[in-house]
Amino acid sequence: MGKFLATLILFFQFCPLIFGDYSPSCCTLTIGVSSYHSKPCNPAQPVCSWTLDLLALSADQALQPPCPNLVSYSSYHATYSLYLFPHWTKKPNRNGGGYYSASYSDPCSLKCPYLGCQSWTCPYTGAVSSPYWKFQHDVNFTQEVSRLNINLHFSKCGFPFSLLVDAPGYDPIWFLNTEPSQLPPTAPPLLPHSNLDHILEPSIPWKSKLLTLVQLTLQSTNYTCIVCIDRASLSTWHVLYSPNVSVPSSSSTPLLYPSLALPAPHLTLPFNWTHCFDPQIQAIVSSPCHNSLILPPFSLSPVPTLGSRSRRAVPVAVWLVSALAMGAGVAGGITGSMSLASGKSLLHEVDKDISQLTQAIVKNHKNLLKIAQYAAQNRRGLDLLFWEQGGLCKALQEQCRFPNITNSHVPILQERPPLENRVLTGWGLNWDLGLSQWAREALQTGITLVALLLLVILAGPCILRQLRHLPSRVRYPHYSLIKPESSL
């Protein structure tokens, strides 16, 4: 029985060596001075996942940029899609003796701070560009505005890659490095960046402390500055510590490496210190020494001066525009009345000429009737002379012809109304109203001026207000930021 137990114990001891050590590990993604651990992954569970925020990545990379003048990500780029470009300079072999991949000339090699060519000339397929990476198997990601979920195969952990926003102009680029690592001995105590209720210790009410610090800052500046709190990655947070409190020499675990640590030996806080900071390793440690305080980065911005609003500008402009419109309307009315008067005189002259022509036609018609009567009288006399031969037509051996003069067209011509009554003037409305021509034209001009004045009063202030606010929409005020360390 003892031999069986000894054999069983040895079997369980050497079982990891036989079947492989599948202890939990992860893939660490590094950008700037910050590191992000993936969810547990190993060769048996090869998918390494991250949930990242693009704004936080930009803040992390800004602390230690890989190249100068790198364009940062902002809300302007939120509508554009991401592309992932792996760097395939060396292909690792975890069994030892790594080897280089085949040479590959990529015309879209990343350059700072731009991608070197247009997106439609790049030889990428889908969302990833590499001759050795497959999008669905080796890496895939989903993007929801500024939120990014990356799934990387564990065999590809160790490759650096870049994220690119394909936006017009300079494209924001993130340079990320990955390496396999072990999970930290304890779970990360830091909560997501957007949660300011509890940091490191859930029992500390951070909302009230932040409000107290903001109130003290406002009082120290005599309420002449705006206090801004940067909710970036936790690695960019600042630490205030008291060098008067010693740190225990016992072994402690580093929890957070802040980007800035400021000694404050004579600072009096409205509450006690909450964390333990080790100045030798520049990190927040797990020892309960309580000599420091972790704060998000503060920035002070001067309050913009509010310019006095001139309320007389709009009424003066309205009255000026109204006066100009009224003057233009009066001038137009006078010009129109004069043109109508000249048109009326022209119609009168044309009507006089038509009446004279009508009288001449009537006189000619009467003369023609008299000539016809004379011809008929002579015809009857000649018929009497040639009575014995059967009349004038028989004697001449011709067909008899009789006059047929109609008298119906001349009365119609005389009954037509004058030309002035048949031509419409003004607005095309034949409204008489028992008024003279000048009175009708004055009434039309007055109605036009009233309508124009009402239009200016209703629409003028709105148009002037929009034109007045147009420069402020195009030009944004820029205020210089005062770093918090300058006030400490």
UniProtKB/Swiss-Prot annotation:
Disulfide bond positions: C393-C400
Determine the domain of life of the protein's source: Viruses
Q: Which residues are glycosylated?
A: N140, N222, N244, N272, N404
Segments spanning the bilayer are 443-463
Q: Can the keyword NAD be found in this entry's annotation?
A: no
Q: What job does the chain carry out?
A: The surface protein (SU) attaches the virus to the host cell by binding to its receptor. This interaction triggers the refolding of the transmembrane protein (TM) and is thought to activate its fusogenic potential by unmasking its fusion peptide. Fusion occurs at the host cell plasma membrane.
Q: What is this protein called?
A: Envelope glycoprotein gp62
- Which species is listed as the source? Human T-cell leukemia virus 1 (strain Japan ATK-1 subtype A)
